[in-house]
Amino acid sequence: MAENSNIDDIKAPLLAALGAADLALATVNELITNLRERAEETRTDTRSRVEESRARLTKLQEDLPEQLTELREKFTAEELRKAAEGYLEAATSRYNELVERGEAALERLRSQQSFEEVSARAEGYVDQAVELTQEALGTVASQTRAVGERAAKLVGIELPKKAAPAKKAAPAKKAAPAKKAAAKKAPAKKAAAKKVTQK
């Protein structure tokens, strides 16, 4: 009797799995049938559209010479030239209006005080960005030098004195305006002081 209860316990999950597989198979078969039907409908629809398009093209080929003849009869070369000149004048006039409008908008922007302020502020930000970039480059260079010196000491290699690299860095800073150079030198000295404390 214990064996029957074990079989019954196993039987239900197996039958559930078999039922799920059967349901999945039925669903897949239904999908395949639907896809086949749709494919056949699409083929039929496509064939009819192709036939309609061919019929239209054939009719256009037949009607085109007649339509061209009618157009030639309706419009002489002079009438066509006049129509083209009219379109050209309208396009040129519209273009000129847009140019005038753009010039007026630019003048309004320039006459506003905020435009000048924004322009001056933008120049200030650019100057600050240049200063900060040069400052960061100086800091990175000095820190790289310090790391190189430490590594050389560990290996036992003697590096040239700091006086030569400092002379090279100074002319690069002098190339900038005097106010910026003074601002750059002060942070660079602070960075050097930090290196000394780190050793």
UniProtKB/Swiss-Prot annotation:
One Gene Ontology CC term in the entry: cytosol
Compositional bias ranges of the Basic residues kind: 181-199
Biased composition (Low complexity): 162-180
Keywords associated with the record: Cell adhesion, Glycoprotein, Hemagglutinin, Heparin-binding, Virulence
Region annotation (Disordered) ranges: 162-199
Entry's free-text remark on domains: Heparin binding seems to require the C-terminal domain of HbhA. Progressive truncations from the C-terminal end diminish the affinity for heparin.
Protein's name in the database: Heparin-binding hemagglutinin
GO molecular function, one term: identical protein binding
Remarks, miscellaneous: Serum from patients diagnosed with active tuberculosis that had not been vaccinated contains antibodies that recognize HbhA, whereas serum from healthy individuals does not contain any.
Similarity comment: family membership: To M.leprae HbhA.
Function: Required for extrapulmonary dissemination. Mediates adherence to epithelial cells by binding to sulfated glycoconjugates present at the surface of these cells; binds heparin, dextran sulfate, fucoidan and chondroitin sulfate. Promotes hemagglutination of erythrocytes of certain host species. Induces mycobacterial aggregation.
Source organism: Mycobacterium tuberculosis (strain ATCC 25618 / H37Rv)
Biological process according to GO: adhesion of symbiont to host epithelial cell; heterophilic cell-cell adhesion via plasma membrane cell adhesion molecules
PTM entry text: Glycosylated. Glycosylation may protect the protein from proteolytic degradation and be important for hemagglutination. It suggests that the carbohydrate moiety may be located within the C-terminal domain of HbhA.
First-listed, main subcellular location of the protein, grouped into a coarse class: other
Localisation per UniProt entry: Cell surface
